[in-house]
């Protein structure tokens, strides 16, 4: 069922006049005299309980990317985490930053008898989490909690019933020792941990982000944990100390880099880190799964008046098939040439504890390949950039969100940073050729949109038809540019290996 159509049915069932009422109405339904009316209604609309369907509705209407860094876990990624976190005899699972429960649901699919401890700070998403647990008849404790400061605001207990879990709000948490932790925490929040916090006495995460703060919190509760994190945790300078200490202790078992474009609301690339405090060696298995994926198309109706509501737009993402999930699991157990590498602690130390897979692959350089000259490649790149720059779009920030252009603007900025680095490298080689900057989009704070909108208060409906074509044109040219940049990269490789070229380290 298409998202908008599904959302309308769910919102009508909860008697929501507008989407922002959704969390409140769900909570009212759960604590009403007849919660089974709504639970039955949900099952009638969607009888597949193996997927967190409510997640997509909440994310579309209510998720907070800017402040809380909320991006909810794709189902196939949650399924991979469920299998990676398996061990015999598990009874209790801790879901750190549980969100709407996507990870918990996939873990529950593997074993319906598991008990869950779910911690989540966002008051708005707690009702969605409770509904997801109850409709699946899951035994759980749910805490609305600031995991970093350890402040607890609300506690709920869910006990299995005949068909649905019964929910009860309680005053105090009943401590339960988890066997494993699973988590997709908010990425790179800023938070300075307290000096006397026993979770961080041996390993102190940086104040600039909380990625490893969440990890260390989980490892203070149980010996095994599986985390989805941004790939920056593998290379950033300010998190080097955490990587080093975790490797010294032998707690980091596996690193898996994932394909891009798996999340709906962010282009940040991600990885999975598997921890095991019972592991006896300091070696770490590094798996490059960035090229293992299956493209999927998600359909969604347009926003705005009827002419756009009845138009279905398509967006492509990457997902993992069951076969690909099984392949990744297998790669974590054995080495495969340049895909999964068992890296000794000493080798990681040689690379300053940078855990990017590329550092540990064997270089394969074919001297028989003859590349075109730099000038010729750069000329082709500039041809693509010039064509893309012919139309410059200046658009108000609010309208950019409405038209799904914020990702395009981010790509423009990221591309210019790559161009800056390559131009610096070309100068090192004594070449005069230079790649042009991208100038095809500008996000403005003024109420303006140029290609050109005459009314500054009203957004022309024509643009809602035009923009999907514009985005596809940019994506096409981005792919063409990436192909040529890859050719330029390969041409530079001999000069890079010989030391004639150096690139600055831009990691924080």
Say what each PLM segment does:
Residues 344, 366-432, 436, 444-508:
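Amphipathic alpha-helical coiled-coil/heptad-repeat segments
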Residues 73, 210, 266-268, 480, ...:
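A generic structural signal for residues located within well-ordered alpha-helices
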Residues 75-183, 188-192, 230-231, 248:
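Conserved S-adenosyl-L-methionine
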């Amino acid at each position: 069922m298409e998202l908008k159509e599904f959302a309308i049915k769910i919102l009508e069932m909860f008697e929501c006049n507008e989407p922002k009422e959704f969390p409140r109405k769900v909570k009212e339904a759960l604590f009403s005299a007849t919660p089974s009316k709504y639970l039955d209604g949900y099952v009638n609309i969607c009888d597949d309980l193996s997927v967190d369907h409510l997640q997509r509705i909440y994310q579309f209407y209510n998720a907070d990317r800017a402040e809380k860094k909320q991006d909810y876990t794709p189902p196939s990624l949650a399924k991979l985490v469920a299998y990676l976190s398996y061990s015999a005899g598990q009874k209790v699972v801790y879901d750190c930053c549980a969100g709407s429960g996507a990870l918990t649901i996939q873990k529950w699919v593997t074993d319906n008898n598991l008990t869950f401890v779910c911690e989540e700070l966002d008051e708005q998403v707690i009702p969605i989490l409770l509904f997801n647990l109850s409709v699946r008849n899951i035994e759980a404790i749910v805490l609305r909690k600031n995991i970093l400061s350890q402040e607890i605001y609300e506690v709920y207990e869910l006990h299995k019933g005949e068909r649905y879990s019964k929910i009860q709000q309680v005053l105090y948490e009943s401590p339960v020792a988890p066997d494993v932790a699973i988590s997709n925490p908010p990425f790179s929040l800023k938070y300075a941990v307290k000096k006397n916090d026993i979770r961080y006495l041996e390993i102190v995460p940086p104040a600039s982000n909380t990625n490893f703060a969440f990890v260390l919190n989980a490892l203070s509760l149980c010996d095994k944990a599986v985390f989805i994190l941004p790939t920056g945790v593998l290379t950033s300078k300010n998190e080097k100390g955490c990587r080093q200490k975790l490797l010294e202790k032998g707690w980091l078992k596996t690193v898996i880099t994932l394909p891009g474009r798996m999340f709906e609301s962010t282009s940040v690339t991600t990885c999975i880190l598997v921890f095991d405090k019972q592991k006896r060696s300091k070696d770490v298995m590094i798996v490059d799964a960035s090229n293992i994926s299956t493209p999927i198309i998600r359909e969604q109706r347009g926003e705005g008046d009827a002419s756009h509501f009845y138009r279905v737009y398509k967006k492509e993402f990457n997902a993992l098939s069951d076969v690909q999930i099984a392949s990744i699991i297998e790669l974590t157990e054995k080495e495969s040439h340049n895909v999964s590498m068992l890296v000794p602690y000493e080798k990681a130390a040689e690379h300053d504890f940078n855990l990017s897979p590329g550092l540990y692959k064997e270089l394969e350089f074919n001297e028989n390949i003859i590349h075109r000259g730099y000038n010729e490649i750069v000329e082709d790149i500039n041809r693509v950039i010039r064509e893309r720059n012919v139309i410059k779009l200046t658009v108000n920030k609010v309208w950019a969100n409405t038209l799904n252009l914020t990702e395009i603007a981010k790509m423009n900025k990221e591309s210019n940073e790559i161009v800056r680095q390559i131009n610096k490298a070309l100068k090192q080689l004594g070449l005069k050729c230079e790649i042009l900057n991208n100038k095809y989009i500008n996000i403005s704070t003024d109420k303006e949109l140029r290609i050109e909108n005459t009314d500054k208060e009203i957004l022309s409906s024509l643009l809602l038809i035009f923009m999907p074509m514009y985005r596809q044109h940019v994506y096409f040219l981005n792919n063409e540019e990436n192909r040529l940049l890859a050719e330029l990269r390969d041409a530079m490789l001999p000069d890079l290996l010989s030391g004639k070229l150096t690139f600055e380290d831009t990691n924080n």
